Amino acid sequence: MSDPEKGNPKLIGQPVQTWYWYDQYLNNPYWVANMYNDYLKRDRLLANITLDAKIWQNIKYQTRFNVDYVTQNNLNEEYAGMNRVGFDYVGGKYYNGDSRSSDIYNDHMLTWNDRFNDKIDVNVAVGTSFSRHYDRNTSITTAIDTCGVPNAFVPQNNKHSRPNNPNGSATSASDSWNNKDWSTALFATASVGLFDKVYLDGSYRLEWAQSFQQFTQGSGYKSFDYYSAGVNVLIDKFLPRRDWLNQLKWRGSWSVVGNPIPNTLFARQSYDFSNGTISTRPPLFDDPQPETTTSFETGLDVWMFENKFNFDLTYYNSTLRNQFLYVTTANGESKPVNTGKIRNYGLEFQASYRWNINKDWRWQTGFNIAWNDNRILETYKTESGAPYEVQMGPNAFKIKYVEGGRYGDIYVNSFARDENGHIKINDAGNYENAVPVMASGKYETKVGNMTSPVTLGWNNTFTWKNFTLYFLIDGRIGGKVMSLTEADLDLYGL
């Protein structure tokens, strides 16, 4: 189907839509199901090799090597007559893309464990790891409608090869790109057990990532370190033995972990092959840092009644720093920065019970509930020193990240109201063209938060011989939901 008033003689003899509504958003669903073809073929190779060797007494060596290789082909064909935004396809659309990627991981580790005087256990591990990622993509597309001969889905049938094609409304394109990334690290972990009652753990990691090396200016490799410490105390070992108590453990941990910035060349300038121009240099990335999360956690684990019943209670507090994002500068440029501080803290509780009804029947049930609160403690400061507001979302509402607010706060435009609380209308005498008066149009009214502070769940597993039935009921308490459908219904008075 083409424009019913102008017609399209090139589609004579071709399959077309039979559809009453000629609208850019409406297509016959059977047409879409059968004349919009998308083929995807993927081949994947996975390989894992592990080598273990005993060097001397309690010292062991292990190395692992993993490879993940993927090739993929994506072919997309849209037949002429598909209605799109602002036009209809008079020739059809064609896309063909080939990609391949590989991920390689290798590590080497030495471990040593021993027990002294039948009271102290020591476990130590040191090692190094290396990972590498590579991907390449080549694609050919007729980017809107460039097929000179309708529904001939081959790369030769495009506006470039047929410059006099009156039906070509956009150019075709060929694209090829590749990406490489690597990271390497040195790490060490240690665990000490005292009298089978107290266990102390610690770890350290020194990491190099390719994304940071562009900022070294030839002065070596830039690295970052992460670390953690933990303690576990078996309290029941310090108490008189009780038959109903199997284990009572207190645990605590503290850690600093991080993620590198995206692996892209931040000072990259683009070259236009059609006219030979070079884009302006983007703003500099000042003092790039990894995104880091500092976490503290403590809790109790309890096992009772021959390990049939157990529960644990956990308190956690974590702070995310140096989030990577792009901000808009005063002159409208997009600048990469590390900024912000978001704190999350909360409580988690879970319990489970196992009942062996008889030799064939068994029932296990579990319940969990968690409460979480977060606060945005810091955001990026503009050149004037004012906090920078990050917002996202459709025109109906925005999710704003404002200093002092919470992650997921929803803001909307509000209506101006008169002294009686009624919404003001821009022209009360002409109701046909009248529209409500907005208070500001800058999404300044906070209406709630989209995240639920409380989550919970109840699971049950019934086992009879070799047959198992499992079901889960979960839920969220709190949080706001925005309905764009309801807004459209209000528009039509429904």
Where in this protein do the model-derived segments appear?
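Solvent-exposed loop/turn elements at secondary-structure boundaries
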Residues: 134-167, 239-296, 308-342
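Outer-membrane beta-barrel transmembrane strand signature
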Residues: 5-52, 162-189, 193, 199-203, ...
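Conserved small-residue
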Residues: 138-147, 337-343, 354-450, 488-493
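Short loop/turn motifs that connect adjacent beta-strands in outer-membrane beta-barrel proteins
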Residues: 5, 56-58, 115-122, 197, ...
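Hydrophobic, lipid-facing positions within transmembrane beta-strands of outer-membrane proteins
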Residues: 45-49, 102-108, 122, 184-190, ...
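Outer-membrane beta-barrel pore domains and translocons
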Residues: 65-70, 127-131, 203-207, 232-234, ...
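Transmembrane beta-strands of outer-membrane beta-barrel proteins
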Residues: 61-65, 122-126, 200-202, 246-252, ...
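Small-side-chain secondary-structure face that scaffolds active or pore-lining regions
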Residues: 42-44, 50-147, 191, 209-224, ...
